[in-house]
Amino acid sequence: MLARPSRLTRRPDYVACYNTGRRYFSKHFIVFALEREGAAPVWRYGLAVSRKVGDAVRRNRTKRVLREFFRLYQDDMPGGMDLVVVPKRRLDPRRVTLDLAVQELLPLMREIRDSLCREANDGTP
């Protein structure tokens, strides 16, 4: 598990990501990304796995796989960002693997990092 400073822990942090963050979509996940102004270049992540995904066993498996993804690929994450990952309803928790998370989330993380670089260079969103 990543250190506490790397995780979103308060409801206002999640709400800010949902309301003002940009959305990125893959087949099975939605990622809300919010750039923190004037923040240290540390990224934070949060998981929002609802009961629509399945019972407690399936939700916990999904969260374990996503936490492992963030632990393994923490060097590839964009700095100064808050990220909230939400599995879509059609995701079958029995099929969630680390390979699926890498296949879908790693390109999204690169897209987020690239869009940040573009915005920093252009000055436009």
UniProtKB/Swiss-Prot annotation:
Family note: Belongs to the RnpA family.
Q: List the disulfide bonds.
A: none
Q: Name one GO biological process term.
A: tRNA 5'-leader removal
Instruction: State one molecular function term (GO).
Output: 3'-tRNA processing endoribonuclease activity
> What are the alphabetically sorted keywords of the record?
Endonuclease, Hydrolase, Nuclease, RNA-binding, tRNA processing
Against SUPFAM superfamilies, the record matches this protein to: Ribosomal protein S5 domain 2-like
Recorded hits in InterPro entries, A to Z, give:
Ribosomal_Su5_D2-typ_SF, Ribsml_uS5_D2-typ_fold_subgr, RNase_P
**Reactions catalysed according to its record:** Endonucleolytic cleavage of RNA, removing 5'-extranucleotides from tRNA precursor
| Enzyme Commission code | 3.1.26.5
Signal sequence bounds: none
Function as written in the Swiss-Prot or TrEMBL entry: RNaseP catalyzes the removal of the 5'-leader sequence from pre-tRNA to produce the mature 5'-terminus. It can also cleave other RNA substrates such as 4.5S RNA. The protein component plays an auxiliary but essential role in vivo by binding to the 5'-leader sequence and broadening the substrate specificity of the ribozyme.
This protein's name: Ribonuclease P protein component
UniProt source species: Oleidesulfovibrio alaskensis (strain ATCC BAA-1058 / DSM 17464 / G20) (Desulfovibrio alaskensis)
Q: Which residues form a coiled coil?
A: none
Please name the top-level EC class of this enzyme.
hydrolase
Report the superkingdom from the record.
Answer: Bacteria
Entry GO terms, CC: ribonuclease P complex
Oligomeric form and interacting partners: Consists of a catalytic RNA component (M1 or rnpB) and a protein subunit.
